Amino acid sequence: MPREKPRADEIAIEMMSVCEDETEVEQDPRELYEEEMKEQQQIDCSKQQKEVVAIEELEKRNINKHFFSIQPNTQIPVISSNYIAPVDTSRLLVLIGKTKATYPIMKMFSLSVLAGMLLSVGGLLSITIGKGIPSSDIGIQKIVFGFFNSVGLNLVVLCGGELFTSNCAFLIPGFMEGAYSRWLFFKTHFVVYFGNLVGSIFVSTYFGKLLGSFESPMYLSAVKQIGETKVAMNWGRALLSGIGCNWLVCCAVYFSASAKDLLSKLVVISFLVLTFASLEFENCVGNMFLLSLSHMYGGNFTLGQWILNNLIPVSIGNFIGGTFLLGIPLWYVHVSNVYNIPFLDPLYQQSQAKTQ
């Protein structure tokens, strides 16, 4: 039998039902978003409640199990808005190094001259205050000298100057990652080193000698003694002292990069500079100011002795300390792919076995 054609009224009823279904399905996006947010809040609240219950049960079980209530294999989260994690700070060094290495040469030179001048201001202040203390109180004299010497590095960091010593740690991670060429790496070190020398000698000449800041007998003998003692140091001691100095200097600048607020930056830099200055470690940029000032005030040494006996070994030591004691370790641990040793890394062995 031939199939009957649907009537017009039946077709209209079906179309109306379909439209009603579609209107029921379609909802306001705001309502959907609010419903999703409510569901997510309920899930988060339930998770937090479960975590609180789990922590309370764990504390009840292990309250007397370990000495001083220290529980092994438990992670304690540290939440601070004023602190950047070491991993993130170390990865940031790659970007900082690339930025430094790709500066236009005049900008790089200007920032390095500024850094040499600002660091020398700290040297002026430390001599004026530290060497004014009687030499019988040698411990207090070293502490005061080191504390006010930190003013220079604080000014350099806050003004964004280019310092050879801190660049030893800040340039190597980006270079190891291939962010810039070998030519840019060595060019940056050379330009910054020369700019620091120009800035340091300018301050020692203008503010130190021409203004007669240290012509009194007490300061005159102290300034001469500083230069003569540094030049009389043997090559090996100057090299090792330079390594230790720049290790601490680079730590100070690195830790200041991980701090977000100004006070934290000033505190960490001041204490680490106080440490290396009190220990009488050698800083090549600081010595550019101190030895040039001592030479201008009649220190018993020649320019050749200054360069050969102090500037060269201390500069090499500073490069080793910043590059190999901080820059490369930070890059290896936090930036590079960790090189697993098969017979010492069980997780590496398991992953290799699964792939095979």
Swiss-Prot record:
It is found in: Membrane. Residues 1-108, 164-182, 259-265, 332-356 are cytoplasmic. PANTHER family: FORMATE TRANSPORTER-RELATED, FORMATE_NITRATE FAMILY TRANSPORTER (EUROFUNG). Homopentamer. Its main location: membrane. Monocarboxylate-proton symporter; active in acidic-to-neutral pH range. Transports formate, acetate and L-lactate. InterPro entries: Aquaporin-like, For/NO2_transpt, For/NO2_transpt_CS. It comes from the Eukaryota. Belongs to the FNT transporter (TC 1.A.16) family. Keywords: Membrane, Transmembrane, Transmembrane helix, Transport. It catalyses: (S)-lactate(in) + H(+)(in) = (S)-lactate(out) + H(+)(out); formate(in) + H(+)(in) = formate(out) + H(+)(out); pyruvate(out) + H(+)(out) = pyruvate(in) + H(+)(in); acetate(out) + H(+)(out) = acetate(in) + H(+)(in). Gene3D superfamilies: Glycerol uptake facilitator protein (1.20.1080.10). This is Formate-nitrite transporter. Residues 130-142, 204-237, 287-310 are extracellular. The chain crosses the membrane at residues 109-129, 143-163, 183-203, 238-258, 266-286, 311-331. PROSITE patterns: FORMATE_NITRITE_TP_1. One of its GO terms (molecular function) is high-affinity secondary active nitrite transmembrane transporter activity. It is a multi-pass membrane protein. One of its GO terms (cellular component) is plasma membrane. One of its GO terms (biological process) is nitrite transport. Pfam families: Form_Nir_trans.
